[in-house]
Amino acid sequence: MANRIMLNETSYHGAGAIKEIANEAKARAFKKAFVCSDPDLIKFGVTSKVTDVLDEAGLAYEIYSDIKANPTIQNVQHGVEAFKASKADYIIAIGGGSSMDTSKAIGIIIANPEFEDVRSLEGVAPTKKPCVPIIAVPTTAGTAAEVTINYVITDVERKRKFVCVDPHDMPVIAVIDPEMMSSMPKGLTASTGMDALTHAIEGYTTKAAWEMTDMFHLKAIEIISRSLRLSLIHISEPTRQAE
């Protein structure tokens, strides 16, 4: 049986990585960003760390903030309409899983309008085209939505959630910058850190594991075990936050 691993086209890791967003946008001839970020991140100045980079580079953008903790069909529909109105040609997703999931759904529907019924994306939808290019900038360490092909949408009307799996929704660029996570409270740092550790353990123990995934998961377990508790004790220490 063949093993498959899917990765972003490009990823940046480390302090100051968000500065590369402008370089990538220019290199790819992107014209205008559709910035997806939740209201709290905007309120507390986290989103502005990225938009400041865009401003300094003279790059156009529009912010979409109708993001819920568990993104709904309506959030996605509103986002699709807002994206069309913005005349943007790429998405910058800033936040945790909610912003990432909303961005993926918006990007898929824009590129594959025959799936405008959000429910039609449930499961493994037979989309034909890659979604609108997404630059994913996580602000937590737990979901890893910036490097996965999955997203979850809430159907409020039917009181259920559904999972969508689509290789076409993989962000083209992931930007993992510890400065985007430095303002997380201790409780959220602990819970998302444990979430990341759980993913690493599950990835190592799953029957689908193989040599390359073992390499990633064992190293992740080592780093998280070494640094999570220390990052809570020394919350402002950049080295621990970076790990």
Protein language model regions, located:
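Conserved active-site and cofactor/substrate-binding residues in soluble primary-metabolism enzymes
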Residues: 16, 20, 45, 49, ...
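Conserved beta-strand elements of the Class I
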Residues: 34-35, 90-92, 135
